[in-house]
Amino acid sequence: MTCYNQQSSEAKTTTTCSGGVSSCYKKTWSDIRGTIIERGCGCPSVKKGIERICCRTDKCNN
């Protein structure tokens, strides 16, 4: 599985997921800096107020 792993508005980068991980995620939230976006492998739990999208195809979390 290959997922994007860049933060917010950085240039696109990818990572190859290890350990049999078969999903990618994109988390979005707002704070005093504005909208923050985090991407990576897996499908982590999130706290209230954080939007999470999980998907199961290569590079699906842009």
UniProtKB/Swiss-Prot annotation:
Q: Entry's Pfam families?
A: Toxin_cobra-type (PF21947)
CDD domains named among the record's database cross-references? TFP_snake_toxin (cd00206)
Compartments, record wording: Secreted
- Tissue expression from the record: Expressed by the venom gland.
Q: Where is this region: Disordered?
A: 1-20
* Major location (coarse): secreted
Listed A to Z, the keywords are: Acetylcholine receptor inhibiting toxin, Disulfide bond, Ion channel impairing toxin, Neurotoxin, Postsynaptic neurotoxin, Secreted, Toxin
| Disulfide partners | 3-24, 17-41, 43-54, 55-60
- PROSITE patterns annotated for this entry? SNAKE_TOXIN
Spell out the family assignment given in the record's similarity comment: Belongs to the three-finger toxin family. Short-chain subfamily. Type I alpha-neurotoxin sub-subfamily.
Protein name per UniProt = Short neurotoxin 2
